[in-house]
């Protein structure tokens, strides 16, 4: 932003540089880490709090069909994972990390607070659904603000964490572990608090709490910017503040284009088919270029690494498209077919993933180190295979639990077990994903490969919406009885379980062969990393 910032008007001097010994510390780490921890915790609080309610809000308040709601959700998640590529590039080349985070946080506040204006609920009269056009468009516009806000904030705040430490600082990994704990803490609390408020007191209260959380994050980052010691300053402040057209500086034009991007996202959310076509074209061009480059410019070892990486990205798309059912089909299944008791609500069950991560991530970290020291640690392809099998087993557990039901209502323990299996799968795959890209990429197209990796997450989000739409349960004046809706879910859950388990087992069989092609790039364990979503 244009306001005054520490060291924003010049490059940090040697004494100010983030890589030097920080003047103030907290628990042995730079004091700026606390600012970033709290900012990201509240940002994730707002994101996951809204996410826990969104599919229920679409189907219950706006009375949108399951299929339509799932496609909107999938489009939203897809764009959320695609936009950080552009947000990161803009920050690196022009804005600087600090300004990008501030701009993203402001957009997020606008989006989350916009979600709190729920308007009158939709009604059914004579078989026709009537809903407020104004509040429907407010919904889409609010989601668009959140999408672009995440794009500017999410990739850049993580980068600032890295710049608080010298490259060889032994505290660096520990600092990132603390930072990622903030992500999971925010997600855990949000899916409990926002979901409970939204489903019991009214949607506006749940979404409003998410917005208040983002406001807290914005305030903390703004007030604590002095503790960042110049980390995240623009690469060229003079160029950024040069007037280029219409009397506006380059910085102001970037903000204006960010608002234009909000309008583009607003339209894509209402036209999921066009978004799918755009993703398909862009993905085909990107992957085609990478393959062409590997054939023309790479030696045999480099080409093999690139092709293995592209293959593992395909399995990543499969895993995350099934994992993302948590926000759509699994939440609707929970609402309609799970025995929840008097305390828990459907959205609150999403908290089990974040809770299990906080409990199990340290154990997995120790496990990988223990296995690595004995030469038993699974290779990257094997970890991807184990993750895929586990996400399939999670759905298989639900099918088994459903078959024990006599009235269409499933005991909550089966759903909790599914979340446990999905989380252990996530712990096998997520920490090694980015590491794989950095290790296997040819230096000449390393940035391109990182972009393709993020694009694969966008594909997974969109595919997840398509999968959830296949489980659309007819709704209207007379919704299906639990036993009837259960049969719809069980049929698709069974197919998903079979596909994932077969695919995972096939990859596990192939993993020794794949490892030979990537052996020159393999490095020691990734145990120090944590899942980042």
Regions found by a protein language model. Name each.
Residues 80-82, 223, 281-293, 343-374, ...:
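Transmembrane alpha-helices of Major Facilitator/SLC transporters
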Residues 74-92, 109, 154, 188, ...:
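Central cavity-lining transmembrane alpha-helices of secondary-active solute carriers
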Residues 1-28, 167, 195-331, 335-341, ...:
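Intracellular loop-helix junctions on the cytosolic face of multi-pass helical membrane proteins
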Residues 2-44, 123-137:
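Cytosolic juxtamembrane N-terminal segment immediately preceding the first transmembrane helix
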Residues 52-72, 326-349:
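Short amphipathic helix-loop junctions that connect adjacent transmembrane helices
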Residues 93-109, 302, 370-389:
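Cytoplasmic membrane-interface "Motif A"-like loop-to-helix N-cap segments
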Residues 79-80, 171-191, 198-199, 206-217, ...:
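Glycine-rich segments within core transmembrane alpha-helices of 12-TM secondary carriers
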Residues 104-134, 385-407:
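C-terminal ends and interior cores of transmembrane alpha-helices
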């Amino acid at each position: 932003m244009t306001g005054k910032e520490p060291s924003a008007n010049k490059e940090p001097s040697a004494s100010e540089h983030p890589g030097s010994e920080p003047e103030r510390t907290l628990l042995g780490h730079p004091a700026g880490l606390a600012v970033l921890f709290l900012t990201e915790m509240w940002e994730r609080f707002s994101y996951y709090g809204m996410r826990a309610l969104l599919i229920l809000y679409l189907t219950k308040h706006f009375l949108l069909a399951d299929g339509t709601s799932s496609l909107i959700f999938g489009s939203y998640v897809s764009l959320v994972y695609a936009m950080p590529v552009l947000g990161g590039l803009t920050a690196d080349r022009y804005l600087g990390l600090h300004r990008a985070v501030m701009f993203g946080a402001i957009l997020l506040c606008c989006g989350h607070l916009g979600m709190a204006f729920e308007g009158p609920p939709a009604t059914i009269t004579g078989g026709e659904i009537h809903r407020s056009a104004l509040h429907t468009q407010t919904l889409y516009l609010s989601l668009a603000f959140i999408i672009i806000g995440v794009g500017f904030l999410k990739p850049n705040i993580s980068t600032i964490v890295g710049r608080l430490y010298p490259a060889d600082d032994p505290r660096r990994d520990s600092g990132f572990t603390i930072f990622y704990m903030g992500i999971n803490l925010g997600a855990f609390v949000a899916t409990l608090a926002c979901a409970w408020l939204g489903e019991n007191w009214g949607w506006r209260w749940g979404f409003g709490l998410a917005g208040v959380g983002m406001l807290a994050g914005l305030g903390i980052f703004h007030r604590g910017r002095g503790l960042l010691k110049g980390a995240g300053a623009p690469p060229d402040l003079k160029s950024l503040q040069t007037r280029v057209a219409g009397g506006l500086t380059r910085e102001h034009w970037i903000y204006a284009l960010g608002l234009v991007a909000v309008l583009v996202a607003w339209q894509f959310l209402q036209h999921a088919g066009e978004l799918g076509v755009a993703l398909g074209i862009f993905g085909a061009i990107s992957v085609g270029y990478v393959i062409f480059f590997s054939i023309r410019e790479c030696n045999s070892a480099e080409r093999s690494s690139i092709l293995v990486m592209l293959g593992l990205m395909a399995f990543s798309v499969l895993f995350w498209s099934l994992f993302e059912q948590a926000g759509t089909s699994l939440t609707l299944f929970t609402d309609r077919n799970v025995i929840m008791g008097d305390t828990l609500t459907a959205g609150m069950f999403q908290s089990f993933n974040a809770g299990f991560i906080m409990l199990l991530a340290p154990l997995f970290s120790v496990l990988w180190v223990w296995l690595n020291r004995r030469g038993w640690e699974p290779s990257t392809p094997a970890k991807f295979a184990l993750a895929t099998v586990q996400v399939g087993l999670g759905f298989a557990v639900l099918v088994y639990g459903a078959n024990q039901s006599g009235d269409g209502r499933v005991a909550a323990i089966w759903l909790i077990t599914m979340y446990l299996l999905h989380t252990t799968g996530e712990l096998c795959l997520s920490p090694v994903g980015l590491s794989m890209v950095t290790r296997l990429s040819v230096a000449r197209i390393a940035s391109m490969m990182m972009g393709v990796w993020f694009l694969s997450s966008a594909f997974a989000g969109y595919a997840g919406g398509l999968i959830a739409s296949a489980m659309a349960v007819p709704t209207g004046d007379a919704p299906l009885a639990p036993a009837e809706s259960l049969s719809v879910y069980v049929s698709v859950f069974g197919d998903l379980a079979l596909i994932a388990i077969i695919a995972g087992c096939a990859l596990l069989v192939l993993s020794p062969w794949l490892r030979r092609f990537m052996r020159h790039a393999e490095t020691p364990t990734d145990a120090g990393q944590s899942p980042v979503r």
